[in-house]
């Protein structure tokens, strides 16, 4: 993860719990499962700090709503695909300089709490 430089802000969305179709086994194809999504986003925030106006900030609510809609309305065979599609949604915002997306699938393995995939993008 890039170092946080002066004038930059780091936004973290933690444990966004959604339900979707994820997996390749029959029961996964037929039944929605929980996934936990964690986001880290870096963007230049000097204007937002100075002006104190949402028009100058990265609106994490807008990004989160787009992710919720996309994840809940689609089906995914692989965590890798879901993670990349979420990362693509985040990176659509031109203010984003760096983003990291982790998708966690609880109880994906019998003796593990969860399995997760993390992908990152930057410009």
Curated annotation (Swiss-Prot):
SUPFAM superfamilies: Tetrahydrobiopterin biosynthesis enzymes-like. Disruption phenotype: Deletion of the gene abolishes intra- and extracellular monapterin production. Signal peptide: none annotated. GO terms for cellular component: cytoplasm; cytosol. It comes from the Bacteria. GO terms for molecular function: dihydroneopterin aldolase activity; dihydroneopterin triphosphate 2'-epimerase activity. It holds the Pfam family FolB. It is an enzyme of class 5 (isomerase). Homooctamer. Dimer of tetramers. This is Dihydroneopterin triphosphate 2'-epimerase. It comes from Pseudomonas aeruginosa (strain ATCC 15692 / DSM 22644 / CIP 104116 / JCM 14847 / LMG 12228 / 1C / PRS 101 / PAO1). The lineage of its organism: Bacteria, Pseudomonadati, Pseudomonadota, Gammaproteobacteria, Pseudomonadales.
């Amino acid at each position: 993860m890039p170092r946080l430089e002066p004038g930059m802000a780091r936004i973290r969305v933690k444990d966004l719990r959604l339900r979707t179709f994820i997996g390749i086994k029959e029961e996964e194809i037929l039944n929605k499962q929980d996934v936990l999504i964690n986001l880290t986003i870096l963007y230049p925030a000097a204007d937002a700090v100075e002006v104190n106006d949402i028009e100058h900030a990265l609106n994490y609510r807008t990004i989160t709503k787009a992710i919720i809609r996309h994840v809940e309305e689609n089906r995914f065979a692989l965590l890798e695909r879901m993670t990349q599609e979420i990362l693509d949604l985040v990176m659509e915002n031109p203010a984003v300089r760096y983003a990291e997306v982790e998708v966690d699938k609880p109880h994906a393995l019998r003796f593990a709490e969860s399995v997760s995939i993390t992908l990152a993008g930057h410009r």
